[in-house]
Amino acid sequence: MARRIICAKLGIEADGLDAPPFPGPQGQRIFEHVSKEAWQDWLKLQTMLINEHRLTPFEASARKFLEQEREKFLFGGGTSTPQGYVPPRS
């Protein structure tokens, strides 16, 4: 049976993650308060941010930027898309 949580992002009861996404207090907070659906939404946005901003994830400044955006997306009011971003056509 899936673990159910009240998702901080979606504001609904939903399936929780199977394990913390990474070690430490931030990973534990996400594990306890973010649903699988919201985490998948974040991963899609993170990929877009990496591509649009041409980030190199192993650089400290890029990791810090992604950490701030993740916090805003999951627990704050959301993030904005990069300036000039045009979504792909279906």
Swiss-Prot record:
Keyword hit for Protein biosynthesis: no
Name of the protein in its database record: Probable Fe(2+)-trafficking protein
Gene3D superfamilies: Fe(II) trafficking protein YggX (1.10.3880.10)
Function: Could be a mediator in iron transactions between iron acquisition and iron-requiring processes, such as synthesis and/or repair of Fe-S clusters in biosynthetic enzymes.
Keyword Endoplasmic reticulum in record: no
GO biological process, one term: cellular response to oxidative stress
Coiled-coil ranges per UniProt: none
One GO cellular component, as annotated: cytosol
This protein's UniProt keywords: Iron
InterPro entries the record matches: Fe_traffick_prot_YggX (IPR007457), Fe_traffick_prot_YggX_sf (IPR036766)
Family from the record: Belongs to the Fe(2+)-trafficking protein family.
Taxonomy, superkingdom: Bacteria
GO molecular function terms noted in the UniProt entry: iron ion binding
Organism of this sequence: Methylococcus capsulatus (strain ATCC 33009 / NCIMB 11132 / Bath)
Record NCBIfam families: PRK05408.1
